[in-house]
Curated annotation (Swiss-Prot):
The protein's name in its UniProt record: Fiber protein
Induction entry: Expressed in the late phase of the viral replicative cycle.
UniProt main location, coarse: virion
Note, other: All late proteins expressed from the major late promoter are produced by alternative splicing and alternative polyadenylation of the same gene giving rise to non-overlapping ORFs. A leader sequence is present in the N-terminus of all these mRNAs and is recognized by the viral shutoff protein to provide expression although conventional translation via ribosome scanning from the cap has been shut off in the host cell.
Annotated segments matching region Disordered: 1-36
Compartments it resides in: Virion; Host nucleus
SUPFAM superfamilies: Fibre shaft of virus attachment proteins, Virus attachment protein globular domain
High-level lineage: Viruses, Varidnaviria, Bamfordvirae, Preplasmiviricota, Tectiliviricetes
Family statement: Belongs to the adenoviridae fiber family.
Written domain comment of the UniProt record: The tail region anchors the fiber to penton base capsomers, whereas the shaft, built from several repeated motifs, allows the knob to protrude from the virion.
GO cellular component terms, semicolon-separated: host cell nucleus; viral capsid
Transmembrane feature ranges: none
Amino acid sequence: MKRTRSALPANFDPVYPYDAPKPSTQPPFFNDRKGLTESSPGTLAVNISPPLTFSNLGAIKLSTGAGLILKEGKLEANIGPGLTTNQEGQITVEKDSDGLTFTSPLHKIENTVSLSIGEGLEDESGTLKVNFPSPPPPLLFSPPLAEAGGTVSLPLQESMQVTEGKLGVKPTTYSPPLQKTDQQVSLRVGPGLTVLNGQLQAVQPPATTYKEPLLETENSVSLKVGAGLAVQDGALVATPPNVTFSAPLEKNGNAVSVRVGAGLSIQGNALVATTSPTLTFAYPLIKNNNHITLSAGSGLRVSGGSLTVATGPGLSHINGTIAAVIGAGLKFENNAILAKLGNGLTIRDGAIEAVAPQPSFTPVTLWTGPDPNVNASINGTPVIRSFISLTRDSNLVTVNASFTGEGSYQSVSPTQSQFSLILEFNQFGQLMSTGNLNSTTTWGEKPWGNNTVQVQPSHTWKLCMPNREVYSTPAATLTSCGLNSIAHDGAPNRSIDCMLIINKLRGAATYTLTFRFLNFNKLSSSTVFKTDVLTFTYVGENQ
């Protein structure tokens, strides 16, 4: 039987068949192209490719380019001022960033940049388009107008000229000091000159007078000086007075010293007594060897080196004064201890008795009406139909609201920018015209018996406003907001977030409520902007 010979490769060299590398038969064994390689025959190495490389110490490291940085072992985007990362790790522009400014006709509201357009321009599917008017009929020109090559011209004589596109007579020019005012030519004169009876004359300067201590003699002015002053080398200087010293002071050269007698001495440039008088102590002071103590009687005691009043049960020291210790049901008022009374109790003839309950609080509701028109604007365009009601019951205000988009906001996509609807109120609780949901829409009080809107203001409207002491700084409530939930039967990925911001004041407003819609990237696809009914509560304002 003939043995089959294995086929040789096409590039086999029978003279020198040693070109192809042979796998190492010595450990360690490895599988090429799976993280390990043989950097030189018999040497095991890690198989890496860019952006991986080796450091000077032989460790594997990651090479980073512009815009990337390694921080605490993690690869991050190297972002500068005005940029930040959101919860999804996306790079976004900071909300309060001042990195970009916009000038008219560009305007920025919230996170949206818009372009104001005037006549002759329109927005067609996001593209700015020019509306060209119909061409006018051809014009005919008669003298002195002439038309040549599509240009209309007006021949001018020597005395005529065109200035800034206006036809006029060439004016006569005048050089200073001559000037033309209205239809007159006048002469401008400076200090020392005047025009009198149509003639130019010089004005004589007034005579100079001098008051003491200045003195004029012939053509010179001098200064009179008194005691303590003198003029030396043309300068005014003070001359020292002749001072005399009486005992115990005496003057030696330029030094003044004090003479001391018995019982006094000068130590460290200070006058001190050299002997101590004998001290005697009267009651309640007692001298014991070199110590002086205070004898305290009833009601007094020495504590911590201080004389204090000894207090019994029911009394204590508070901020250096004696105060009574009171328990539950008592309070201090007008320097007297009184009973602390709750609801339904009062004091009559020195005794506590129950009182009849007060009549219940009548709720107040402010609203837009049951079926409002498109009453909220974004970028100056009415596009949101907003139903909002504020109901004050007891100390809390309940907010019920729902919103439906119209026009360009009839549906929203995951890339929709955040936007806000703002209600601004004055100090009386009346809706102002400065928000994008303002007093130009239907707004007022709801009667108990029907669904109308009473627009006549009332002093009770203030009760529906956020309490300014409770919300002295802006406060917010964030809640999930489903979109078109009934049509989609509560399907997932059909909700965004709505934030109610309380008293984020601006301008002349006293109270504000801001409905801010955000996190549209939670949507899976384009969705009709028709929110579920949103409910919030906050503490109401005092009457």
